[in-house]
């Protein structure tokens, strides 16, 4: 505890706040483990791999989902330095988590795999860091691999950042080679935090909910300080509260007397209302508030929408509570109640398909819920009588409209030059428009395309990986809306439209998607005593049809010989009964059919 006593009184000149920018699998979590080892942050008996990836899901998928903040004490001959590491995700869907971490730092380690070179998502996060004027320290990792091409990767970084070749640190996080040099570079190259205002201001860059202590916020103090007992105010929600405790993670929670300018730590607010202290908010003193909040980061807008329904109708309230809790930790999650053929559920908005999968898995694991998820869709703009409406659910699309516009993204794809033809072919199939192409190095090309978001969120990433044998990487950002020839494909089972299976697609692909849907449903809908037509329709026109054959019930089995008219009478009666069933019978669609159709 001796070191922690000094922590709260440490001079701002001896603090360094930094984050790690890296692509998935480039060794960021392993490097974080080595930095923790070298600063003795974790006792040897408690060391595990990827110690900052606390969520079971993060370790299982080998990705970082939530940003984490850890304080390291680094002993050098010139004294003890406090290094605050803010660990960030690398996947495109979690760019928002990265932007939050960047807002809380003065410097960044740019970690690149020496065998793969820089990737598209790393590039996107690097530009984000440069916009915030962060000091960038380039680090080449995995130099111990036999396939590592250190000179080529170094040249790429030198060209990209305009640095000298000797400024690029060459390390192996796995073996620990060169890692101490990273700690020295953090101290020597990254500037200390600076205070600009006399009033207290702290930026909330993450938060979570504790059932006993209420909302716990992770914050970076930019001006002034925070201590236990202070009356403070969240500038966004204007909610006032008293601080119950402040402290830091090293990496276990450690209470401190105060958090001073430049320090990163947690604040226990004791608030029970999840929405009172949102991510991106500024905490200031209630008695002497700051005139304006810190420039947080833009409110992110969801790009992918889907319906989430509990399989048991009674679980509706549990699902609402679970979503509200996840939303506290994940400000980019959006949800609102909706009702359909599947019962009561929620229309949810996500940053991308991986984000959607992660939220679904967390709901099922952490809250023990059984869920049905409808097809993902995007937000369309529909012009009706000159008025623009937003539609996220295909069943809300009006019968007639003047124009429909779809969201477009600008995708940056980096791939080896021998795969350029395959990538261009894929982008054209997905209705992409080429914007530019440039060589990053003699072997790797950066292609830029404008693509409809609806085409990107389905199987674009899988196709890109398979066509380039896993060598391509991509990143995208929204660029607005464009008019498109889109239609709504409705599914009718026994003449009844099934809202949950409606999709909005480009007219050229309507037949193909409609055909695939009805064929899948034909396999999965159980046979009835009457024929069940399964149709896909655009407006009033049926574009594809399959029939679930009726099974025959042998009504004459009880007749032993005797008059043929007796059998005929029974068969006529059955025929009339079937005709009546066909008119009034509702076909129950099993959940497997919904799930299979959704995945098409």
Swiss-Prot record:
Residues 13-194 form the tr-type G domain. The keyword rRNA processing does not apply. SUPFAM superfamilies: EF-G C-terminal domain-like (SSF54980), P-loop containing nucleoside triphosphate hydrolases (SSF52540), Translation proteins (SSF50447). The lineage of its organism: Bacteria, Bacillati, Actinomycetota, Rubrobacteria, Rubrobacterales. Keywords: Cell membrane, GTP-binding, Hydrolase, Membrane, Nucleotide-binding, Protein biosynthesis. It comes from Rubrobacter xylanophilus (strain DSM 9941 / JCM 11954 / NBRC 16129 / PRD-1). Its main location: membrane. GO terms for biological process: positive regulation of translation. It is found in: Cell membrane. Required for accurate and efficient protein synthesis under certain stress conditions. May act as a fidelity factor of the translation reaction, by catalyzing a one-codon backward translocation of tRNAs on improperly translocated ribosomes. Back-translocation proceeds from a post-translocation (POST) complex to a pre-translocation (PRE) complex, thus giving elongation factor G a second chance to translocate the tRNAs correctly. Binds to ribosomes in a GTP-dependent manner. Belongs to the TRAFAC class translation factor GTPase superfamily. Classic translation factor GTPase family. LepA subfamily. GTP binds at residues 25-30, 141-144. GO terms for molecular function: GTP binding; GTPase activity; ribosome binding; translation elongation factor activity. NCBIfam families: lepA, small_GTP. It catalyses: GTP + H2O = GDP + phosphate + H(+). Its EC number is 3.6.5.n1. This is Elongation factor 4. InterPro entries: EF-4 (IPR006297), EFG_III/V (IPR035647), EFG_V-like (IPR000640), EFTu-like_2 (IPR004161), G_TR_CS (IPR031157), LepA_C_sf (IPR038363), LepA_CTD (IPR013842), LepA_IV (IPR035654). One of its GO terms (cellular component) is plasma membrane. The gene is lepA. The keyword Nucleotide-binding applies. It is a peripheral membrane protein.
């Amino acid at each position: 505890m001796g070191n922690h006593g000094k922590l709260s009184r440490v001079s701002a000149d001896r603090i360094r706040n930094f984050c790690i920018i890296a692509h998935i699998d480039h060794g960021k979590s392993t490097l974080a483990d080595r930095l923790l080892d070298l600063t003795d942050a974790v006792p040897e008996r408690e060391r595990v791999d990827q110690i900052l990836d606390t969520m079971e899901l993060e370790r299982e998928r080998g990705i970082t989902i939530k940003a984490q903040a850890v304080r390291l004490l680094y002993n050098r001959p010139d004294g003890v330095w406090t290094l605050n590491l803010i660990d960030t995700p690398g996947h495109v869907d979690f760019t928002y988590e990265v932007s939050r971490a960047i807002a809380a730092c003065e410097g960044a380690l740019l970690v690149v795999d020496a065998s793969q070179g820089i990737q598209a998502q790393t590039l996107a996060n690097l530009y984000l860091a440069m916009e915030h004027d962060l000091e960038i320290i380039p680090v080449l990792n995995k130099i111990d691999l036999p396939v590592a091409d250190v000179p080529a990767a170094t040249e790429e970084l030198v060209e990209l950042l305009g640095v000298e070749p000797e400024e690029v640190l060459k390390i192996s996080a796995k073996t620990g080679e060169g890692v101490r040099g990273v700690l020295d570079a953090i101290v020597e190259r990254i500037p200390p935090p600076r205070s600009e205002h006399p009033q207290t201001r702290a930026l909330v860059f993450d938060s979570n909910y504790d059932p006993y202590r209420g909302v716990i916020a992770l914050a970076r103090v930019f001006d002034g300080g925070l201590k236990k007992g202070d009356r403070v105010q969240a500038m966004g929600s204007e909610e006032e509260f008293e601080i119950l405790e402040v402290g830091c993670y090293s990496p276990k929670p450690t209470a401190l007397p105060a958090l001073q300018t430049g320090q990163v730590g947690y604040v226990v607010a004791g608030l029970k209302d999840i929405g009172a202290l949102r991510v991106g908010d500024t905490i200031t003193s209630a008695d002497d508030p700051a005139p304006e909040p810190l420039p947080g980061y833009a409110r992110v807008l969801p790009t992918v929408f889907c319906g989430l329904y509990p399989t048991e109708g009674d679980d509706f309230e549990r699902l609402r509570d679970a979503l509200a809790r996840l939303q506290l930790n994940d400000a980019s999650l959006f949800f609102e109640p909706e009702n359909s053929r599947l019962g009561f559920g929620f229309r949810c908005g996500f940053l991308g398909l991986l984000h959607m999968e992660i939220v679904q898995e967390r709901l099922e694991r952490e809250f023990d819920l059984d869920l049905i998820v409808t097809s993902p869709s995007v937000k369309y703009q529909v012009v009706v009588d000159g008025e623009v409406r937003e539609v996220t659910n295909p069943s809300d699309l009006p019968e007639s409209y003047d124009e429909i516009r779809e969201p477009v993204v600008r995708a940056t794809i980096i791939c080896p030059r021998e795969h350029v033809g395959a990538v261009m072919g894929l982008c054209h199939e997905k209705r992409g428009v080429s914007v530019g192409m440039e060589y990053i190095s003699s072997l790797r090309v950066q292609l830029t395309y404008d693509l409809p978001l609806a085409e990107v969120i389905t199987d674009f990433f899988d196709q890109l990986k398979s066509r380039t044998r896993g060598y391509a990487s991509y990143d995208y950002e929204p660029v607005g809306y464009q008019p498109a020839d889109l239609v709504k494909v409705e599914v009718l089972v026994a003449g009844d439209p099934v809202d949950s299976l409606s999709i909005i697609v480009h007219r050229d692909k309507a037949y193909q998607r409609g055909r695939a849907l009805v064929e899948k449903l034909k396999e999965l809908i159980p046979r009835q005593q009457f024929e069940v037509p399964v149709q896909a329709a655009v407006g009033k026109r049926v574009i594809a049809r399959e029939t679930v054959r009726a099974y025959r019930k042998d009504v004459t089995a009880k007749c032993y010989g005797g008059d043929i008219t007796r059998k005929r009478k029974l068969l006529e009666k059955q025929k009339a009964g079937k005709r009546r069933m066909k008119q009034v019978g509702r076909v129950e669609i099993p959940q497997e059919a919904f799930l299979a159709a959704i995945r098409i």
